[in-house]
């Protein structure tokens, strides 16, 4: 349907922001329901992929795609396993299509914020899980993401804490990171 509408209008999409997402807390197999798990995969992975694939043919040089990922992409997060896996997909997908679209002059940026006070957390529940992690200011995240996209950066991680987390996740054994991120 989206592709048909874009074709009808002879659209020239300048910016695509894949911001829809959801998460759930709870252990997979018990705690998180199958419906919750599939909702996360369907929205965070399948919908993002299909919307992107549908819109790309309607983009020209100078267009930008912004995908909302998360610091959860850097390391598996117990009790948010499916969410962190879905965001790892978003980051990997972004890196891959950024390279594929670069010759066409289309830039792709993944923003990887930490927790933010948005409607996302009302739906995900378990707000206390993130009590010790510095929260991101949504307005600052958006401003930084726009700057990063304009510069053609493939990844943008706001705040010093989140940048440090990304760095540590790259150098420490995954087993240690999983233990540290157990929420």
Where are these regions (language model features)?
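Conserved amphipathic alpha-helix within the SDR
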Residues: 1-12
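Conserved mid-core segment of classical short-chain dehydrogenase/reductases
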Residues: 23-38, 79
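Residue(s) in the substrate-gating loop at a strand-loop-helix junction
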Residues: 70
């Amino acid at each position: 349907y989206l592709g048909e509408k874009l074709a009808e209008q002879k659209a020239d999409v300048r910016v695509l922001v894949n911001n829809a997402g959801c998460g759930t807390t709870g252990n997979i197999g018990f705690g998180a329901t199958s419906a919750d798990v599939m909702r996360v995969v369907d929205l965070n992975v399948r919908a993002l992929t299909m919307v992107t694939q549908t819109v790309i043919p309607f983009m020209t040089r100078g267009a930008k795609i912004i995908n909302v990922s998360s610091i959860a992409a850097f390391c598996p997060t117990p009790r948010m396993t499916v969410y962190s896996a879905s965001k790892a997909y978003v980051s990997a997908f972004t890196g891959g299509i950024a390279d594929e679209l670069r010759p066409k002059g289309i830039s792709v940026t993944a923003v990887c914020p930490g927790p933010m006070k948005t409607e996302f957390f009302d739906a995900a529940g378990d707000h206390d899980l993130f009590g010790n992690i510095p929260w991101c200011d949504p307005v600052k995240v958006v401003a930084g993401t726009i700057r990063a996209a304009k510069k053609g950066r493939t990844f943008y991680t706001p705040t010093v804490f989140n940048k440090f987390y990304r760095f540590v996740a790259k150098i420490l054994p995954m087993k240690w990171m999983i233990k540290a991120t157990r929420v």
